[in-house]
């Protein structure tokens, strides 16, 4: 009996710190730990590649605004954003890592928020678009995708731009699409090297490679199904981390107002827009 009581007391003592930690608010946990754990997508140029990029700069700046350190949690995207939110924001991965305090680069979309009630999406910091870059000497004007017929065009096949081009005009462009590129940055480099006359991808990808080169024009992809206004990207935290969400929102507004946010994008050759 006495042994069972001792074991019960020991178990209670061990559990007490964990229980107290769980009782802390999201912001209080960050401050107690002394660092903001930030989830970052692997291999997402120009936002994150091997510990560098716009999202890495932004993660550090947000942590500095909260007066804590930063701990980066890079991860590979799963099959859906909902999976990423589950693994990185509100539950953690089944392999034992996560969750983070905040996930970067989350689409700020009502449908996504409604479908994921355990998370809070906030602090939009950039507006992304699907775009196409072209060599001006080869394609002075690009009013429609019909001008690309019979011309080599680089695009990542497993991307929104790739999906739009592969299905455009009943598949009329398929024969000359080069889709083996891993992302829009690689496609843009192929264009810069003269391998193709145009490259499609996200505006940020193309601008980071070609934005300063007057030989090329970068414009919205003239495809009827392309989101004309693009989409905002922001951050996500657990739904009940209200004080952390408010602190991050204030921090983002401060970075925007001071010009620091725009400077982060400019350092990567990407014009900041929201």
Q: What does each of the following model-derived ranges do?
A:
Residues 73-146:
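Acidic, polar ligand-binding/catalytic clefts
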Residues 83, 102-115, 164-167, 192-229:
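A ligand-binding cleft/hinge motif common to bilobed small-molecule-binding domains
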Residues 24-101:
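Extracytoplasmic small-molecule ligand-binding "clamshell" domains
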Residues 56-65, 136-139, 146, 151-152, ...:
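Extended ligand-binding regions for polar small-molecule ligands
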Residues 37, 51-64, 129-182:
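Bilobed "Venus flytrap"/periplasmic-binding protein-like clamshell domains
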Residues 5-21:
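N-terminal export signals
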Residues 39-44, 73-77, 92-110, 159, ...:
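Beta->alpha turn/N-cap motifs
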Residues 41-42, 126-131, 210-252, 269-274:
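Periplasmic-binding protein-like
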């Amino acid at each position: 009996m006495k042994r069972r009581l001792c074991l019960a007391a020991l178990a209670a003592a061990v559990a007490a710190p964990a229980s107290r930690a769980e009782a802390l608010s999201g912001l209080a946990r960050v401050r107690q730990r002394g660092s903001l754990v930030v989830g970052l997508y692997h291999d997402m140029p120009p936002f994150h590649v091997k510990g560098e990029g716009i999202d890495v700069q932004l993660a550090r700046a947000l942590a500095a605004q909260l007066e804590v350190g930063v701990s980066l949690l890079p991860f590979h995207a799963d099959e859906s954003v909902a999976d990423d939110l589950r693994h990185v924001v509100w539950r953690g991965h089944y392999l034992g890592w996560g969750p983070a305090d905040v996930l970067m680069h989350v689409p700020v979309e009502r449908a996504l928020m409604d479908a994921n009630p355990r998370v809070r999406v906030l602090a939009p910091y950039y507006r992304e678009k699907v775009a196409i870059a072209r060599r001006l000497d080869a394609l002075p004007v690009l009013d429609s995708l019909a001008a690309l017929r019979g011309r080599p065009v680089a695009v990542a096949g497993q991307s929104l731009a790739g999906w739009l081009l592969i299905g455009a005009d009943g598949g009329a462009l398929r024969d000359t699409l080069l889709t083996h590129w891993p992302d829009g940055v690689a496609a843009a480099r192929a264009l810069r090297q003269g391998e193709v006359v145009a490259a499609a991808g996200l505006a940020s990808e193309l601008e980071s490679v070609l934005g300063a080169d007057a030989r090329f024009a970068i414009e919205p992809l003239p495809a009827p199904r392309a989101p004309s206004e693009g989409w905002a990207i922001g951050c996500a935290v657990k739904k009940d981390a209200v004080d952390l969400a408010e602190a991050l929102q204030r921090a983002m507004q401060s970075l925007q107002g001071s010009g620091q946010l725009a400077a982060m994008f400019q350092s990567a050759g990407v014009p900041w827009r929201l």
